[in-house]
Structures are given as structure tokens and as C-alpha cells.
Amino acid sequence: MSLRNKLYEQIASDGNRIRLRFNPSHPIFAGHFPSNPIVPGACLVQIAEEILSERLNRPIRFTTISNLKFHQPITPDMEVVYQLNENKIEIANPDLTAVYAQFKATYLCTDPDVQ
């Protein structure tokens, strides 16, 4: 199930940088956490997978994730930039002066018809 246009929307794209905003009224924030909502880490990783799949124009799934670090919580009212470099993904503020999360990932194409 895609999170795009439900939990987040893409608002700009510039090469390997994708800017997005979250939907603060999404039901996930009622439970994570009710009085102090933050974007779940699993969702941040899934969004990266969706963005990369769209960029490659083929379905993929991450097979390994390493060096996953959350430096600062991301709240639903924040805009963030996903920066994709080789196998490293960073989630930062729009002017790229603060990195909120980062990880390395390897992936596999999940479409058996794609070589």
C-alpha cells in the first residue's frame, strides 16, 4: 500500500532531491503519538522505497538497510527533503542544513519481467 497522497505528498523534485510534506490529519498520528505526533521511522523508510521505485520506474523493495540513524524527530507539520545518493539516503530540512535521518540500503527489483 502506497503512502503517497495519503501520508505525504511530493511538492518538488530536483534530480536526486525530492521535497515533500506530510498530511497532519492522517490517522497514523493519532497513535504515534497522540499529544506529540511524529512520523514513524518505518514510514520514513517506506517513503524512501516508494521514491526510489518511482525514480527507477520499476517496483523495488529494500533487501538490506544499514546504519539507520534518526537524529531528530520529524513532525507532521514539517517539510523534508529526501536526498538519494548511490545507496545512501538522507532526510533533511529543505535548505539541507540539518539531517533528520539517514541510512544505507540495497534493493531488489520486484517485477519478474524486468531484467
Give the ranges of each region predicted by the language model.
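Active-site helix/loop of acyl-thioester processing domains in fatty-acid/polyketide metabolism
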Residues: 38-61
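A glycine-rich (often HGG/GG-containing) alpha/beta subdomain
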Residues: 2-4, 18, 70-74, 82, ...
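Surface-exposed loop/turn and secondary-structure junction residues enriched for glycine/proline
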Residues: 31-32, 36, 42, 71, ...
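Hydrophobic beta-sheet segments that form the core/acyl-binding groove
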Residues: 61-63, 67-98
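Generic preference for hydrophobic/aromatic residues in regular secondary structure cores
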Residues: 8-11, 39, 62, 78, ...
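N-terminal auxiliary interaction/assembly segments of multi-subunit proteins
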Residues: 27, 31, 53, 57-60, ...
